[in-house]
């Protein structure tokens, strides 16, 4: 559940930024200090009708983001392309989706570490095979 998505104390959260990614490919980065509030529960993002959060991560040393859709498209781009927004904002589109396609998985790369290897179409797939593109493009459908 997303209630456990940020197992980090508030003092530490103030030092970091948090990324939100939804199934309709909306995303934003929010300064962790935005969540330093007196209330126990706080709305962390606005969602469009029918949208839901796919990933919430604390950004520490991640470099690139890789989006994978239900229809098998992948898009890799720099986290620097995602603007920092206020917690009440909807965010920006990360990837152009067609039809009923939606973001299913989110992966991150880190400097000096190998890109993740995932199971895709029942085979091992090295995400380093995905070329870096630009935010708000369609992505590619790799052959496995």
What are these regions (language model features)?
Residues 1, 5-144:
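C-terminal interaction appendages of subunits in large macromolecular complexes
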């Amino acid at each position: 559940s997303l209630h456990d998505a940020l197992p980090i104390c508030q003092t530490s959260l103030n030092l970091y930024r948090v990324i939100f990614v939804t199934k309709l490919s909306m995303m934003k980065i929010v300064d962790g200090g935005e969540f330093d509030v007196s209330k126990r529960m706080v709305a962390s993002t606005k969602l469009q009708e029918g949208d839901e959060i796919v990933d919430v991560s604390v950004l520490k040393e991640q470099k690139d983001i890789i989006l994978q859709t239900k229809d098998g498209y992948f898009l890799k781009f720099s986290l620097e392309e995602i603007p920092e927004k206020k917690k009440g904002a909807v965010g920006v589109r990360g990837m152009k989706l067609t039809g009923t396609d939606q973001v299913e998985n989110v992966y991150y790369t880190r400097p000096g570490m190998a890109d993740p290897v995932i199971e895709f179409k029942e085979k091992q797939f090295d995400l380093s095979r995905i070329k870096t593109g630009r935010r708000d493009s369609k992505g590619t459908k790799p052959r496995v």
